[in-house]
């Protein structure tokens, strides 16, 4: 142990004396007696155990049930607690957040701090958790060696006692705090006590957009090391220019007593051995004594050494092919006997920025990334391996190759799993000061320098051996100050093998190797003062800008969102220096809570009585809290797919397939193709898809099509499926797809239904109140006053619970609401524009209603105007045509005042009395899709249960639309035309009124929305209007047609 690391226990002051110092309000005090950062240690005592990653008996988990007492402030904790548990103590699981176990409340905020902003001071009422745990050590742990305790994550600051004696203090919630317990331990029972503070000055550096919770939320473990032991290991790989050979570079430092550290004869008696294994094969091995080459005029290091092992033709690590070796680093004594060994998974890979491109192993990589918070709806920020694996497998299955640890270092196991399964990682320091004014305030304050620097340097020291980490990040949304420049230089000096990114200060400062904006748009400038966000196509062409551009956050997936995502990917593929980005974000950060009836529901900001709060802004995920996919996850999967397709010729039918894989052959994929007419296959085939990386190949599907007769469009569908299962996917997993509408000339189309009839089955009846059309067992009744079709009777039973009428509104999306809330109105938000224009308060008036009898049909014409504040805003004309087959065709023409903003929709709605189990349609599906989010949807014949037509967004909104539909069948109802539709047990009005999904109640019958036109959902961000111009409804005139029939009456 070095002199700096030695712990000399002194008489322990009383708890009240320690707390009197208020270390948690001093930014220059971040720890007492905490050991230096290093990669995870396990101290194996057998080489084969280290090689095989066998659980080490030298590391013991202390997870489980701990004793817990809660206080509203630290000063209320009695001094005697450090010696023994208090009578009111309860059992608390570790790891966990105490707010999820009945103590205190979770608080959700985005930008604003949850406490008054007065750094470094925090509230006097500072919730405090007092934990204790008893354990018994192995006798040999007491006799010799060093016993450490490791806290992988404690929020936000804590003091530690062992057997009544004070050990130390630490803050930084997201990196390990490790202490030497050796001087405090005894034979038999030992008791540790941990006092955890909810708020500390460190909380000002942890203003991330997440739930603010407290406690010991990651693993706690004991580690036993020999007296002489490995204290740091740094592993890096260096590849030759042609990648045919490599060097494994290992720096190992040893803890040696101070008296011996400058005695070369003593230190050279110890040797470091490095073995490189590939499965059970020893690839390379090297052994050498401690000691380095001279460093400067004062000599060399005696307590460390540097080893370099040459490897010929190494397997290269990438997210596509995560080839891992096992490096075992051993400390040997003078007799060549093993003292201890540490071991790490190692990947040979090179990360470099060359000619403006981020390259992995010499290839420019396209980042298919997502931001991920550590979040679980039941356990909060305590994440286990099962949850981590679930996320990784889902990401891989949906064509993600990268993840940004937003916005803090993750649990150590996360990186091992990313190494193993193959994900590129941006490792981000636990720094965010978003609520500061200005954000850079603390980054320019010298008193906060050590607090900033430890969060960056300790992250690098812990995680730098992982091949999955390709980029370091200095943190998030903390402005750009002198501290950032200093820490950028420190990383570049200490780890020149990886680039550094940092978005603060405008995304293109001197503290970043990558231009990494958040929410910059493809073609639209956002000229904010001081930190403009240029259109990304423009940004890479700015003078003196030669860096790659990778969006650190984009495509804000809040609720029903993600419109325009495909535009980003068109740009990424078109401009080489636009190298992708990280979607915001992975999972809806909702917590499970029980309602007054004991039923669980997903809660968001404010549901726990937390104030301040930012409502549902915590729910921006591609997946629900339980990891069920949002529809937008499929859009991401399709846009990011590794195979691209183009149609070369239709006669013969030839397609071209391009592989975007950089390193792997597509030798586990089959391509399936199918020609469909009205959703039914008329010709299909398949063949192996064995493409080299970055290669393109043409495939001839068929020389000619068979004679095809029938109504509808002809579609060519292709999809790529994996043949064998992989570590992250089952066999037959679909990884890419596309479709084309084939020219009509390839199909012989049958004629539609004829209007001719041999008998007249239609009757028209008019009186002062109604107009009624009758056809056999059904009749339609119009109200003369309202002009609306208010009854559609079949066999004497009315099938309409509400009249069929115009529909111009939708239950507002999060993107429609923007930042508006009761106390803060954003006049630019769509919902506020609609309110101001009176769209929600339109008064309908019927101008005319009249009927005409034609030779084979009855025609009814109705005109309506919609007014607000005595101003006419909309004029609609409905032309109903009833034919001899009992069909009702409606032609709708809508005229819109030029003063109105874009409407949410132009369509019709009604409440049907029927409830059927399934919905069938010919159009885009199977999942929800919208005009600006339909790349992943395919045109075919689909069938789904009614309940699955509703997307259960936690904050209810417009949902469930299916676009470009030509046929809809719901029980006896059948509609044809060209329209979008949504069908649900919930009305638009109920969706607008409900604050949570679990509050929705199924209504009578079924609500049916038929849209001729629907505005896009947007999604570049959620706080400014982001629907692109071509997806707005800004025309003055809209027209559409729908044909209805009730089939069992014909």
UniProtKB/Swiss-Prot annotation:
Keywords, in A-Z order: Glycosidase, Hydrolase, Magnesium, Metal-binding, Sodium
Amino-acid positions noted as binding Na(+) in the UniProt annotation, renumbered to this chain: 209, 617, 620
Entry keyword Aminoacyl-tRNA synthetase: no
Cofactor(s) required, per the database record: Mg(2+); Na(+)
Chain sites annotated for binding substrate: 110, 209, 477, 553-556, 620, 1023
UniProt keyword Metal-binding, yes or no: yes
GO terms of molecular function: beta-galactosidase activity; carbohydrate binding; magnesium ion binding
Positions bound to Mg(2+) 1: 432, 434, 477
Cofactor note: Binds 2 magnesium ions per monomer. Binds 1 sodium ion per monomer.
A cellular component annotation (GO) from this entry: beta-galactosidase complex
Binding site for Mg(2+) 2: 613
InterPro entries: B-gal_small/dom_5, Bact_Beta-galactosidase, Beta-gal/glucu_dom_sf, Gal_mutarotase_sf_dom, Galactose-bd-like_sf, GH-type_carb-bd, Glyco_hydro_2, Glyco_hydro_2_AS
GO BP term, example: lactose catabolic process
A Pfam family per the record: Glyco_hydro_2_N
Catalytic reaction annotation: Hydrolysis of terminal non-reducing beta-D-galactose residues in beta-D-galactosides
Enzyme Commission number(s) from the entry: 3.2.1.23
UniProt site (Transition state stabilizer): 373, 407
Domain of life the protein comes from: Bacteria
Catalytic residues, chain numbering: 477 (proton donor), 553 (nucleophile)
NCBIfam families, A to Z: PRK09525.1
Assigned protein family: Belongs to the glycosyl hydrolase 2 family.
The protein's name in its UniProt record: Beta-galactosidase
Organism per entry: Yersinia enterocolitica serotype O:8 / biotype 1B (strain NCTC 13174 / 8081)
Underlying gene: lacZ
């Amino acid at each position: 142990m070095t002199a700096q690391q030695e712990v000399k226990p002194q008489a322990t002051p009383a708890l009240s004396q320690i707390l009197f110092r208020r270390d948690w309000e001093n930014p220059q005090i971040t720890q007492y007696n905490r050991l230096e950062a290093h990669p995870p240690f396990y101290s194996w005592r057998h080489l084969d155990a280290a090689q095989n990653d066998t659980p080490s008996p030298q590391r013991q988990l202390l997870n489980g049930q701990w004793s817990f007492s809660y206080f509203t402030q630290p000063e209320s904790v009695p001094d005697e607690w450090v010696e023994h548990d208090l009578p009111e103590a309860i059992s608390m699981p570790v790891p966990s957040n105490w707010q999820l176990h009945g103590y205190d409340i979770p608080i959700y905020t985005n930008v604003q701090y949850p406490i008054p902003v007065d750094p470094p001071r925090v509230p006097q009422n500072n919730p405090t958790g007092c934990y204790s745990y008893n354990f018994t050590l192995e006798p040999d742990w007491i006799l010799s060696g060093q016993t450490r305790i490791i806290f992988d994550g404690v929020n936000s600051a804590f003091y530690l006692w062992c057997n009544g004696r004070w050990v130390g203090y630490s803050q930084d919630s997201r990196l390990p705090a490790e202490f030497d317990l050796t001087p405090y331990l005894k034979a038999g029972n030992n008791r540790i006590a941990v006092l955890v503070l909810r708020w500390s000055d460190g909380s000002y550096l942890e203003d991330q957009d997440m739930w603010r919770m407290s406690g010991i939320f990651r693993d706690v473990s004991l580690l036993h090391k020999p007296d002489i032991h490995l204290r740091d290991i740094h592993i890096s790989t260096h590849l030759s220019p042609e990648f045919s050979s490599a060097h494994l570079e290992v720096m190992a430092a040893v803890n040696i007593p101070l008296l011996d550290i400058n005695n070369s004869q003593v230190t050279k008696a110890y040797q470091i051995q490095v073995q490189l294994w590939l499965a059970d094969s020893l690839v390379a091995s090297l052994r050498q004594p401690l000691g380095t080459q001279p460093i400067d005029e004062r000599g060399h290091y005696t307590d460390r050494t540097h080893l370099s092992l040459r490897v010929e033709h190494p397997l290269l690590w990438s997210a596509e092919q995560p080839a891992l070796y096992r490096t075992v680093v051993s400390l040997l004594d003078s007799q060549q006997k093993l003292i201890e060994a540490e071991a790490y998974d190692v990947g040979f890979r090179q990360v470099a920025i060359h000619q403006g491109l981020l390259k992995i192993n010499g290839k420019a990589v396209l980042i298919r990334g997502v931001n991920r918070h550590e979040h679980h709806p039941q356990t909060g920020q305590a994440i286990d391996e099962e949850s981590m694996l679930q996320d990784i497998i889902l990401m891989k299955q949906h064509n993600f190759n990268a993840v940004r640890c937003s916005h803090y270092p993750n649990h150590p196991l996360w990186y091992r799993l990313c190494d193993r399964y193959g994900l590129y990682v941006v490792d981000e320091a636990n720094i965010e000061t978003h609520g500061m004014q200005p954000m850079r305030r603390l980054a320019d304050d010298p008193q906060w320098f050590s607090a900033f620097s430890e969060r960056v340097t300790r992250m690098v020291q812990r995680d730098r051996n992982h091949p999955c980490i390709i980029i370091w990040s200095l943190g998030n949304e903390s402005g750009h100050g002198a501290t950032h420049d200093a820490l950028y230089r420190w990383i570049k000096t200490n780890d020149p093998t990886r680039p550094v990114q940092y978005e603060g200060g405008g995304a293109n400062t001197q503290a970043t190797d990558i231009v990494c904006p958040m929410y910059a748009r493809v073609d639209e400038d956002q000229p904010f003062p001081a930190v403009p966000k240029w259109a990304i196509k423009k940004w890479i062409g700015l003078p003196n800008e030669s860096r790659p551009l990778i969006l650190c956050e984009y495509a804000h997936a809040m609720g029903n969102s993600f419109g325009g995502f495909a535009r980003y990917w068109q740009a990424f593929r078109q401009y080489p220096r636009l190298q992708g980005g990280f979607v915001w974000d992975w999972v809806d950060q909702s917590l499970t809570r029980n309602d007054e009836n004991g039923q669980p529901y997903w809660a968001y900001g404010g549901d726990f009585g937390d104030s301040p709060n930012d409502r549902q802004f915590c729910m921006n995920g591609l997946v629900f809290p339980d990891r069920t996919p949002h529809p937008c996850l499929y859009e991401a999967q399709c846009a990011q797919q590794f195979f691209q397709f183009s149609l070369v010729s239709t006669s013969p039918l030839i397609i071209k397939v391009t592989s975007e894989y950089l390193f792997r052959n597509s030798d586990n994929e089959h391509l399936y193709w199918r020609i469909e007419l009205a959703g039914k296959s008329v010709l299909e085939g398949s063949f192996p898809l064995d493409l080299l990386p970055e290669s393109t190949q043409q495939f001839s599907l068929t020389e000619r099509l068979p004679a095809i007769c029938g109504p509808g469009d002809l579609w060519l569908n292709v999809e790529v499926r994996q043949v064998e299962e992989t570590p992250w996917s089952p066999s037959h997993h679909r990884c890419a797809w596309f479709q084309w509408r084939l020219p009509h000339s390839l199909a012989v189309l049958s004629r539609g239904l004829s209007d001719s009839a041999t008998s007249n089955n239609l009757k028209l009846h008019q009186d002062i109140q109604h107009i009624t059309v009758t056809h056999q067992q059904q009749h339609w009744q119009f109200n003369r006053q309202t002009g609306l079709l208010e009854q559609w009777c079949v066999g004497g039973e009315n099938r309409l619970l509400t009249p069929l009428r115009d529909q111009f509104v939708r239950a507002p999306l999060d993107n429609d609401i923007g930042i508006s809330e009761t106390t803060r109105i954003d006049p630019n938000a769509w919902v506020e524009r609609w309110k101001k224009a009176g769209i929600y308060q339109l008064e309908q008036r019927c101008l005319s209603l009249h009927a005409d009898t034609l030779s084979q049909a009855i025609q009814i014409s109705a005109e309506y105007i919609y007014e607000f504040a005595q101003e006419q805003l909309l004029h609609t004309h409905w032309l109903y045509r009833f034919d001899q087959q009992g069909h009702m065709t409606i032609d709708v023409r809508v005229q819109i005042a030029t003063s109105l903003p874009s409407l949410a929709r132009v369509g019709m709605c009604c409440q049907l009395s029927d409830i059927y189990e399934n919905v069938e349609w010919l159009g885009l599906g199977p999942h929800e899709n919208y005009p600006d989010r339909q790349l992943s949807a395919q045109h075919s014949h689909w069938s789904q249960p009614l309940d699955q037509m509703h997307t259960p967004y936690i904050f209810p909104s417009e949902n469930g639309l299916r676009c470009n539909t030509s046929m809809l069948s719901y029980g006896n109802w059948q509609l044809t035309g060209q329209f979008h539709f949504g069908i649900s047990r919930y009305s638009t009005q109920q969706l607008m009124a409900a604050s949570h999904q679990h509050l929705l109640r199924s209504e009578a019958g079924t609500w049916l929305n038929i849209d001729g036109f629907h505005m896009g959902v947007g999604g570049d961000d959620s706080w400014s209007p982001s629907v692109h111009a071509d997806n707005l409804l800004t025309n003055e005139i809209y027209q559409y047609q729908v044909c209805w029939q009730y089939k069992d009456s014909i």
